[in-house]
Amino acid sequence: MWFPQIIAGMAAGGAASAMTPGKVLFTNALGLGCSRSRGLFLEMFGTAVLCLTVLMTAVEKRETNFMAALPIGISLFMAHMALTGYTGTGVNPARSLGAAVAARYFPHYHWIYWISPLLGAFLAWSVWQLLQILDYTTYVNAEKAAGQKKED
């Protein structure tokens, strides 16, 4: 799945570059005052929140959630709002690579945009597994049942 996504990221970067005049401005770069370690952790936590949202809304199949795209989109929007000024918001290695290829600009810290999403995905999966072990659905279902009893 990685290879097609990377090709698509480069194609999207090239298409966006072709459609916008002048220099490519959508590359990922650390903002002023943002160190590599800060950028690494910000990207990791932004990706973790996004991945945990996907796991809890789209992957968790205990009940159907036809509105899963809404919280996922809101999570991505919030990651962009929080991170763009600091890191340019990668949260996806293919997106970061596509923009870098289109701009022909690979900063010495480009590795952050590859390592952070992997660490963030692992962190989200770990939290999700912990919630599975703690059987969080027992509490969620008890709250839903209590809410239904109040309505009756």
Curated annotation (Swiss-Prot):
Q: Which Pfam families match?
A: MIP
Parts of the chain that traverse the membrane: 6-26, 39-59, 66-86, 111-131
- Write out the GO cellular component annotations: plasma membrane
Tell me the organism: Saccharomyces cerevisiae (strain ATCC 204508 / S288c)
Cite the source lineage: Eukaryota, Fungi, Dikarya, Ascomycota, Saccharomycotina
Molecular-function GO terms, alphabetical: water channel activity
Q: Which residues lie on this side of the membrane: Extracellular?
A: 27-38, 87-110
**Where, subcellularly, is it found?**
Membrane
List the stretches on the Cytoplasmic face of the membrane: 1-5, 60-65, 132-152
Could you identify this protein by its name? Putative uncharacterized protein YLL053C
Predominant subcellular localization, coarse grouping: membrane
> Which family is this protein grouped under?
Belongs to the MIP/aquaporin (TC 1.A.8) family.
For whether the record's keyword set contains Transmembrane, the answer is yes
Q: Which domain of life is it from?
A: Eukaryota
Q: How does it sit in the membrane?
A: Multi-pass membrane protein
User: PANTHER family attached here?
Assistant: AQUAPORIN TRANSPORTER, MIP17260P
In its keyword annotation, does this UniProt entry include Transmembrane? yes
Q: Which SUPFAM superfamilies match?
A: Aquaporin-like
